[in-house]
């Protein structure tokens, strides 16, 4: 055998081997494919059965839900049907009742028609009888029916007038007695329900010190400290033998309070000299102004009054440092406000409005300007200026009869003002006249041009007038003091003599840096 034959057999062997491998591989692949397909069919069948079960469960669930809904709707329909049947029965019963009532009404109508015919017949007979009797009476009395009627009316009229007059007089007397009793009851109840302290305002303040050594420091060298404090505060300081006490005298409570607080701060600080005194007095004056505003706010809050203008609140706070015939003005105004509210409630009026008018009724006593205008009219102008209601303004202006009373609140304010001021010990006219005289002294001096401040001290026996250095000169100072003295002699009544001191001070301040 040659090489060719070997190669041929080798090739045929390879072909046969490859064919056998291919057949075996094909058989294996076919078997594997059939296994995979069988497994897939089994899994598909399982999934199919699972899905069928899920669908069946959902179907059964939906079927159950639908059956429940159908049952509920059937129940509702049955309920509605039963209600409709009940309503139908009710309507049928009502229809029967209406039919029955209609039959009864027809029967009553027939009876009324018969009765009306009988009444008409009787009326005709009565008219005929009346005519016959009237003619018979006229023939007997000799008077016609009209004349007899007129005489009867006149007789009845006179009798009615007499009875009415007696009845009216009786009602008037009873009303007077009732009104008098009711008025007394209201006033007594109002006074009983307002309990206030009675305290007479003085024109001096006692400043207590720890030791008499401080007196010398307050007086200063040759009295310069005490003079500086008197000039800055506008009050008289009395240092005598009274142990541990200094008396601050002045008719203006604001000035006395400023001097007291300034002294307190100076003594605590220890530095007492004219420059420090002026600085402290200026600082304390601002503090007192803030305290005045705070007092006004507390007062209106305590009384439950809202919506007041800030300037009115400031004036109310300033009442704390004003007095009327020795009676503290703020206490008097609060008392009057409470009395007005109680009395207005008893009379069926607005208590809040009455309380507001009572608080503001003496607001015209607070400002220092326009002294020639009565305080009631000045108070009314202030209320009008700060947009208070017309009946409030009228009550303030009319409580001393300067203007006509236009509302029911005005007489209440007038009465309550009188009640508050008429209590035993509430007022002291001598002090009021004294304070008015000192105030008139200061206002007289303030009327001159160039005057900055005026202070009446030593119970009105000395008037200190401070003028601006830029508006006057030394030559005019003496002329001014003489003019003021002459006017005081001509226009005012005063005991003893009044010393007029005009102070003109020029200062030049520089700072070294």
Swiss-Prot record:
GO terms under biological process: mRNA catabolic process
The name this protein goes by in its record: Ribonuclease Y
Membrane topology, record value: Single-pass membrane protein
Enzyme class: hydrolase
Regions crossing the membrane: 3-23
One GO cellular component term noted in the UniProt record for this chain: plasma membrane
GO molecular function: RNA binding; RNA endonuclease activity
Signal sequence extent: none
Cited PANTHER family: RIBONUCLEASE Y
